[in-house]
Amino acid sequence: VSIVLAATWDPRGELARLERLMPLLRGWYAAQVVTVPGKTDDRLMLCLEALGIQAQRAEPWTTGRYRALEAAVRFEAAHIHYADLDRLIRWAETRPDELRGVLDVLQTADALIIGRTARAMATHPAALQQSERTVNAVFSHLLGQPLDLPAGSKGFSQRAARYLLARTLPEHGLGTDATWPVLLARGGFRLATLEADGLDWETPDRYLTTAADARLQAEAALIYDAAPDHWRYRVDLAHHIITAGLHAWVQPLDLETEGNPV
């Protein structure tokens, strides 16, 4: 196994599900690195350590993705799978064979942008679909290929990961949805893509003992879309991701963390 998992996780009741999945994850990944928010309590950190996971707190939380990638690189595995852990738990639970196949593809590419199938995208609230469609339209146009960037799952070779760490700031946060692919494309890395059904909407799984079914997803999406604040948040987040990606489009590449990326 030559893949290390680099994941971020803001825990919302998924620990028991993660524990059940660890035999699969140990077979798929040479090591598992997980960053959690600074507020995460010591008991949970000890649970992760007992599972063999390298867990670390990220403070501020916006540095979580960078710190996960940074820690994963130290294992010097050939490839790294970055994933939002709540999405990965659902994926491994509901479609393990698909995920295993994606990891095979991941090992053939310097950069793999894993997107959502139309079926997976349709499970998300309209607020997410509409705002993320704008993000994808901007960067699909600029990078000259269809891309689904905010799906929370990407693959990198060791070389690509080190390239990103040298050219991004830890505080990029969710802006890395765009900054990472943009910087890699500008650096001459080819962006491979594939779509997965397993990246359907994970939020309804919170505090459940198993992944939510399609009925629960649909009910949760209606409730989500009924709140104006959710639409405001999603528009603001899309703006943040686009702004970060456009900065990466013009930032100098020859110096480490040049300028003031969002």
Which residues does each predicted region cover?
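Short, flexible, basic/aromatic active-site loop/helix in glycosyltransferases
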Residues: T108-A151, A160
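Conserved donor nucleotide-binding strand/loop of the catalytic core
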Residues: E49-T63
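Short, well-formed alpha-helical segments that are part of the catalytic scaffolds
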Residues: A7-W28, T40
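A conserved acidic beta->alpha catalytic loop
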Residues: T35-L44
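Active-site nucleotide-sugar/metal-binding loop of Leloir-type enzymes
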Residues: Y66-H79
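Conserved donor-nucleotide/metal-binding helix-loop-beta segment in metal-dependent transferases, i.e.
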Residues: L88-A122
